[in-house]
From Swiss-Prot, chain B:
This is Ribose import ATP-binding protein RbsA. Residues 17-252, 263-505 form the ABC transporter domain. It is a peripheral membrane protein. SMART domains: AAA. It is found in: Cell membrane. Pfam families: ABC_tran. GO terms for cellular component: plasma membrane. ATP binds at G49, E50, N51, G52, A53, G54, K55, S56. Keywords: ATP-binding, Cell membrane, Membrane, Nucleotide-binding, Repeat, Sugar transport, Translocase, Transport. Part of the ABC transporter complex RbsABC involved in ribose import. Responsible for energy coupling to the transport system.
Length: 324, 524
């Protein structure tokens, strides 16, 4: 190890850049993709298209930030797509059917996300259910409740919620929400006791427990946080359409997991960063956008995205091997 | 040396496996240096050496896990290489590890034949499966139900299944890595009966154990290793003191630098602690400045007692009092707040977050207590981690380095450092020097000395009797979940401790309790 340090000090700028590129594979891939797309079609690098990409990536990015907490603790949350729909639908229901003020229904939506996440967290931490199973159950339950509330039809949402999908002073709110959610995610993970505890729990739950960390409480908070993030993503989606859709967010949990993993997190836990997740989410959106511009059918897009996920993780495996 | 070696082996058959001046380095560390070992059919070769002497590296070279950097391996007198475990198996070399390679949910028969399941039209041929498995079990003359689930068997029976599995693959060389560590006295007798039978059948065996009496009972010759060097090959019935002298290579006084500070007030008092199936009626006191050793066999309940004091496991009744304050119990953070620091027995699985940095590992217990409004005190944690790493002489490239890069001894110092940072003055040490090399051991003993000089109290569980005798001021010996007696450190011999340690093991009631302890361990 001491030799590694010496060689790092001696290393030239070129190998430093190589090292950096190896450690930031997703970012390098994103930049390369953007350059490639710009060469292929000048339409790619226009302000409206970039804003479009930002808006398109916002929902998945917000879900993925929440998912980052979960994956850092070596967990998984399959329910975020359904919870997004449930939070949004509950909010719309209380606005359209009950008649509560818009901003209250917005808070209700977020609270429902918190509640759903906390229930998953409690059944994982205290009920000892595997995270995969507990959140699979919540995925089904949350979707079911959404359908029951909505009777299968869209419900118009409150103006306060719709504001989340609009553009003010040239700034699209979905992008602002994504930035806000990302900053909070970064702050929690890097600066707070809660965040640092997540890394310890994901790295070695037993060592964390024996060092006095309240592992179970933290796990409940982690899934509750993921639930709030999911609900926020659902409200943003709703805002763009001005109505809550019963089938909103179906399959989004997989996009969120993909974004986190492309961003460099390991499903084994203990690693993951907000910046990585953001890059992962944007990468997914750029691929979709680029293929759309290039008139590639959406069927092919799924194949490409699958390849990118496999490539990103395979790249990480190689990186970990060479660094050993 | 050459002459005595010829004399030692003049009536022995030719070796079937030879390591000829093999060496192995990991980075700059020379783990094995020009060691030669001959394994002969029908003979038991015991490997003796302290932790870190290189025994496990050596057997990993025999079983194809590691390749030697220098020297050569000969099978049946022909130079060869063992690039992987498959090749070693094809030469008939099988290793029985402490952690058995069995599938607990499958039957005995399926486990014996695992990977070689007989088929008929692509389906499992259960008739052949059972017949071949039975033939393997008959080889060692052990009566085990073929249809029993392996997980339902005791650890001794599982070991027999594993040995039968190895033999059914035509193993000629069996490497037994501390096979007796988890066994009771009677189970050890049974294992040794099997070993004797296998000797008669011409199987060569390499036997690793820390117990000199076992080596004398079952071994033919013993090879002593120290710090990766071959020291001597001797008849297995060589005088124990001589073996210890060769193994340690220096006098005990230097190796255990215990300084006895003034003894103060009781810091840790445990009164009538009971936990069904784990331990019974445990009472003990550790005073400021004192190191109390907790000795006993594996499964005697030592770890369970320490875990309960640390608040990891709940107890049925009894009191834990720290510096006059009674703890509610079953609450780790309460124990930590009152000054208890717990160094668990398995450093990698329980002590460290291996993927995290040295700094994060050091600061784990103080993460929340030093925080302001939920925010980590980053600069403070960093500064204090740097101070304690310096003080404990943790050798590393930087505080940001992953702790997995560090040697076992430096990793363990980091676990100590965590509790130094937390200001713990009651340290519960569970096998504090397991897997730590000799030099780092002394450094850890010095840390223990410093803690007690500052008025700390230390309760130390250790299976290494020389360590207990050398570092503890008093020794409590546990047997069958009870404290069987107390011995002063001065003038006590290993035999005195062992006599107390086995005092409750031989009656069948406690043996059942021991089995239960094993089970509860597995449940966790």
């Amino acid at each position: 190890m001491s030799t590694a340090v010496v060689s790092q000090k001696k290393s030239t700028t070129a190998s430093k850049i190589g090292h950096w590129m190896l450690n930031n594979g997703a970012l390098v891939g994103l930049i390369a993709l953007c350059v490639g797309l710009f060469i292929a079609t000048p339409h790619f690098l226009t302000i409206p298209n970039l804003i479009n990409i930002g808006i398109q990536s916002a929902t998945v990015a917000i879900l993925a930030f929440g998912m980052t907490f979960v994956i850092v603790t070596a967990g998984i949350d399959l329910s975020v797509g359904s919870v997004a729909a449930l939070g949004a639908m509950t909010s719309a229901y209380f606005f359209a059917e009950v008649g509560l003020p818009g901003w209250i229904t917005l808070l209700i939506g977020l609270f429902i996300g918190l509640l759903a996440g906390a229930i998953s967290g409690i059944s994982i931490a205290y009920g000892k259910l595997p995270a995969f199973i507990a959140t699979l159950a919540m995925m089904s339950i949350a979707r079911g409740i959404t359908l029951v509330i909505s009777q299968g039809s869209p419900i118009p949402s409150a103006p306060a919620v719709n504001a989340l999908g609009r553009t003010y002073f040239g700034i699209p709110m979905p992008i602002l929400m994504m930035a806000l959610a990302g900053i909070v995610c970064w702050f929690i993970l890097s600066r707070t006791v809660l965040g640092r505890s997540m890394y310890a729990i994901g790295g070695n739950m037993e060592a964390a427990r024996l060092s006095g960390l309240p592992v179970k409480k933290i796990l409940v908070m982690v899934y509750a946080l993921a639930g709030v993030y999911a609900a926020l993503a659902g409200l943003v989606m709703t805002g763009r359409l001005s109505s809550a859709q019963p089938q909103a967010g179906v399959g989004y949990e997989l996009d969120a997991i993909a974004a986190v993993v492309i961003g460099g997190a390991s499903l084994a836990g203990g690693t993951g960063k907000a910046t990585g997740t953001l890059i992962g989410a944007i990468l997914l959106a750029v691929i979709r956008n680029g293929l759309n511009i290039l008139n590639v059918s959406s069927f092919w897009q799924q194949i490409v995205i699958g390849c990118v996920i496999a490539l990103a993780v395979g790249f990480d495996v190689i990186r970990n091997k060479t660094s050993k | 040396m050459v002459n005595s070696e010829q004399a030692l082996h003049q009536h022995d058959p030719a070796p079937i496996l030879q390591l000829d001046k093999v060496s192995k380095s990991f980075g700059p560390v020379n783990v094995i240096n020009q060691v030669s070992i001959d394994v002969r059919p029908g003979r038991v070769l015991a490997l003796l050496g302290e932790n870190g002497a290189g025994k496990s590296t050596l057997i990993k070279m025999m079983s194809g896990v590691y390749q030697p950097d220098g020297g050569q391996i000969l099978v049946d007198g022909k130079p060869t290489t063992l690039p992987d475990t498959k090749t070693a198996e094809s030469f008939g070399i099988a290793t029985i590890h402490q952690e058995l390679n069995l599938v607990p949910t499958m039957t005995v028969a399926e486990n014996v034949m695992l990977g070689r399941t007989p088929r008929k039209w692509g389906l499992v041929n259960f008739k052949h499966l059972r017949r071949q498995a039975q033939a393997a079990l008959d080889l060692i003359g052990v009566d085990v139900d073929l249809n029993a689930q392996v997980g339902s068997l005791g650890i001794a029976r599982q070991q027999m299944v594993e040995i039968a599995k190895a033999l059914s693959m035509n193993a000629r060389i069996l490497i037994l890595d501390e096979p007796t560590a988890a066994l009771t006295g009677r189970e050890i007798d049974q294992l040794f009966k099997v070993v004797d039978q296998l000797k008669e059948k011409g199987v060569a065996m390499v036997f690793i154990s820390h117990h000199l009496d076992e080596i004398a009972r079952i071994g033919d010759t013993v090879s002593v290793l120290r710090d990766g060097q071959f020291i001597a090959e001797l008849p297995a019935d060589t005088d124990e003191d001589e073996l210890v002298r060769l193994m340690v290579g220096r006098s005990i006084e230097n190796q255990y630098p215990r300084s006895a500070p003034e003894i103060g007030q009781p810091l840790l008092e445990v009164k009538n602690l009971n936990a069904e199936g784990r331990f019974t009626d445990i009472s003990l006191t550790v005073r400021a400045g004192e190191v109390v050793g907790l000795a006993g066999l594996v499964g005697a309940g030592r770890t369970e007692v320490v875990r309960s004091i640390a608040g990891v496991d709940k107890v049925d009744s009894g009191e834990v009092i720290v510096a006059g304050k009674k703890l509610r119990g079953g609450d780790i953070s309460e124990a930590i707040k009152n000054g208890i620091g717990h160094i668990p027995e398995d450093r990698k699985a329980q002590g460290l977050v291996l993927g995290s940095s040295v700094e994060d590992n050091l600061g784990l217990a103080t993460l929340a207590s030093t925080a302001r409004a939920g925010l980590v005190d980053r600069s403070g944690q960093h500064k204090r981690a740097a101070e304690v790493a310096e003080k404990l002489r943790i050798r590393m490239a930087s505080l940001k380095q992953p702790i997995s890069d560090l040697s076992g001894g430096n990793q363990q110092k980091a676990v100590f450092g965590r509790w130094v940072l937390a200001g713990s003055n009651v340290l519960l040490l569970d096998e504090p020097t397991r897997g730590v090399d000799v030099g780092a051991k002394v450094e850890i003993y010095n840390i223990i000395n410093e803690m007690t000089e500052k008025g700390g109290a230390v309760l130390m569980v250790s299976s290494e009797l020389p360590e207990v005798l050398g570092m503890a001021d008093r020794i409590l010996v546990m047997s069958g979940g009870r404290i069987a007696g107390e011995l002063p450190a001065k003038g006590t011999t290993q035999d005195d401790v062992m006599a107390l340690a086995v005092s409750q093991v031989d009656d069948s009631i406690t043996e059942e309790a021991a089995a239960e302890i094993e089970n509860t361990k597995e449940d966790r």
